[in-house]
């Protein structure tokens, strides 16, 4: 989106970043694409008039890496959406994973560890928001095994539903 933004017409250009771009590209793409991302990252971040991020960890990393300032704008949680959620019964030892089925989200890490877990893991990778929230609400815990992350909405949703979260020590988790 940064490249499109460079040529977009507008009075002010704002780029919102969710995680460290070069690290995300490195984890998901070939070495040549990763090398290109690393070499152009600091230049690309000069194009917008304002940079924002929803993660204090991302804000800190970019300050240390490139001495670039980001505005911290936490992603809001629309609590009105939770008002119409049906009540559900807690399911003992149910563990919820809510997210994409992709490498950076670490779903493979959870699947590899599943045989060692004393509980039933429910994967919400292709469900409606309402269905995923019901599963979170009925679970004992939510697991966020991400390899990289800023501040996942899933964590905020689980906390709002009073469900504890176990996550990897990355980004804003």
Explain the meaning of each model-derived region.
Residues 8-26, 52:
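Active-site proximal beta-strand in glycosyltransferases
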Residues 32-51:
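Membrane-proximal helix-turn-helix segments that form the acceptor-binding/catalytic region
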Residues 57, 76:
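Carbohydrate-associated surface elements
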């Amino acid at each position: 989106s940064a490249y499109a933004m460079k040529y977009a017409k507008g009075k002010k250009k704002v780029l919102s970043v969710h995680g460290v771009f070069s690290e995300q590209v490195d984890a998901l793409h070939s070495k040549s694409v990763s090398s290109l991302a690393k070499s152009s990252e600091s230049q690309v971040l000069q194009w917008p008039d304002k940079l924002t991020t929803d993660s204090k960890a991302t804000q800190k990393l970019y300050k240390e890496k490139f001495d670039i300032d980001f505005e911290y704008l936490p992603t809001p949680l629309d609590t009105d959406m939770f008002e119409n959620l049906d009540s559900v019964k807690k399911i003992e030892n149910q563990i919820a994973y809510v997210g994409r089925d992709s490498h950076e989200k670490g779903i493979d890490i959870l699947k590899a560890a599943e045989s060692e877990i004393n509980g039933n893991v429910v994967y919400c990778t292709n469900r409606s928001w309402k269905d995923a929230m019901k599963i979170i609400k009925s679970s004992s815990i939510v697991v966020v095994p991400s390899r990289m992350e800023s501040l996942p909405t899933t964590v905020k949703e689980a906390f709002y539903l009073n469900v504890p979260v176990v996550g990897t020590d990355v980004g804003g988790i």
